[in-house]
Amino acid sequence: MNLEETMPLVFERSIPGRIGFSLPESDVPETNAGDYFDEAYLRSTPADLPELSELEIMRHYTNLSNHNFGVDSGFYPLGSCTMKYNPKINEKVARFPGFANIHPNQPESSVQGALELLYDLQTSLVEITGMDEVTLQPAAGAHGEWTGLMLIRAFHEKNGDTKRTKVIIPDSAHGTNPASAAVAGFDVVTVKSNEKGLVDVADLKKVVGEDTAALMLTNPNTLGLFEKDIVEMAEIVHAAGGKLYYDGANLNAIMAKVRPGDMGFDVVHLNLHKTFTGPHGGGGPGSGPIGVKKELIPFLPTPVLTKKDDAYTFDYNYPDSIGRVKPYYGNFGINVRAYTYIRTMGPDGLKLVTEYAVLNANYMMRKLQDAYDLPFDQVCKHEFVLSGNRQKKLGVRTVDIAKRLLDHNFHPPTVYFPLIVGEAIMIEPTETESKETLDSFIDTMLKIAKEAEENPEIVQEAPHSTYVKRLDETRAARKPVLRYQKEV
């Protein structure tokens, strides 16, 4: 699609002289900016800001919002992303003045309520994960991964075990896992999956050695399958002197049923913006706390939030700490939302979350298994992976199926991931969707499968009803246009 066919940018709508807002007359004396800044930092021409009336601005952004799609708009079965509904009570609590209007440089004594919430959230996450301590510093999932790996690295270095330079990662893992390991200074070793979609324990035994720093796992894995040999894998890694790292992306499948710490994991990161209903989107903020077992506590990033007597305080006395990984809690509001969710649901409610998430995924999988290939035909957890290989033989690719779903007001599932499944379609319904919504999506998927057989062109040319059709996604990824540049 040509850019000329898209909605004009607010800069392109600008008409010189249009006024959208009136400011009161300034009561501050004018001053010369050159008295305070070097000439190199002063503008030679006015800033090219858009000039529009208030009505034009309102219509522009309202029209843009109508072309967005989110969880509040419709079903969003994006596999491995846990796009569950975000309860609006979370928003109400996050907007309490005592939470919304505080500043990071306030004295601890003036923000005891906020610190108490953070401390109680840490305590709740310790209980949910089976860890011994939790830090809320990491900003999001991948940041949590990197932080956890840096703790493991610091642990080995403290023990003089500098030969441990390798992190083992399954071939079905999230792409952030090898990326985080590389950024943390480790070499990545891949362990294969077996014919059941689980980690091949025999292959794990081959790749584990004296140079193993850690094994990173998601359980259930990215195929939505529970790694039933997890205890044996933990024993193998620990016997070799390595650590077991838990990617918490799929915690929604086991929450309040089983704890990573009880499986043998030493480090865990969580995604509060997924499992615990902090909203997705807009590039953040997220929240990626990490939990650790006792022997890794000395290496936690400082300051560590603690409770002394009846007061909450930040403790900097951790000489082996990896240091700060983020200066402030700019994502405090996400933590408030997660805490509200945990307190609202309670232990029994969190258990129901897991049960319904797993039930919904298995229901959908069984309803779709005859129309699409099911690479691993077994009980899944919170998500499942289909394959569009059958449709590919008819000339319809998985990307076509995803685009066709847009015509039915459904966000597409995750596609072409995990990489070990050809034409992968990864579906995660979450626990918050009704049976009626699931049935509607199932009927649409069955209809698309039939169209692939009888009228493939309608699928190949989809979407037909969206404002934007098919973009050059390869060019967008390789040569992105990220800012407006005025034509001269």
Swiss-Prot record:
Enzyme class at the top of the EC tree: oxidoreductase
Signal peptide: none
Cellular component GO terms, alphabetical: cytosol; glycine cleavage complex
Cofactor(s) in the UniProt record: pyridoxal 5'-phosphate
GO molecular function: glycine binding; glycine dehydrogenase (decarboxylating) activity; pyridoxal phosphate binding
Keywords on record: Oxidoreductase, Pyridoxal phosphate
InterPro entries from the UniProt entry: GcvPB (IPR023012), GDC-P_C (IPR049316), GDC-P_N (IPR049315), GDC_P (IPR020581), PyrdxlP-dep_Trfase (IPR015424), PyrdxlP-dep_Trfase_major (IPR015421), PyrdxlP-dep_Trfase_small (IPR015422)
A single BP term in Gene Ontology: glycine decarboxylation via glycine cleavage system
Pfam family, one: GDC-P
EC number: 1.4.4.2
Oligomeric form and interacting partners: The glycine cleavage system is composed of four proteins: P, T, L and H. In this organism, the P 'protein' is a heterodimer of two subunits.
PANTHER family (UniProt xref): GLYCINE DEHYDROGENASE (DECARBOXYLATING), MITOCHONDRIAL (PTHR11773:SF1), GLYCINE DEHYDROGENASE, DECARBOXYLATING (PTHR11773)
Summary of the function given for this chain in its UniProt record: The glycine cleavage system catalyzes the degradation of glycine. The P protein binds the alpha-amino group of glycine through its pyridoxal phosphate cofactor; CO(2) is released and the remaining methylamine moiety is then transferred to the lipoamide cofactor of the H protein.
Protein name (Swiss-Prot/TrEMBL): Probable glycine dehydrogenase (decarboxylating) subunit 2
Origin species: Listeria innocua serovar 6a (strain ATCC BAA-680 / CLIP 11262)
Lineage, opening ranks: Bacteria, Bacillati, Bacillota, Bacilli, Bacillales
UniProt gene name: gcvPB
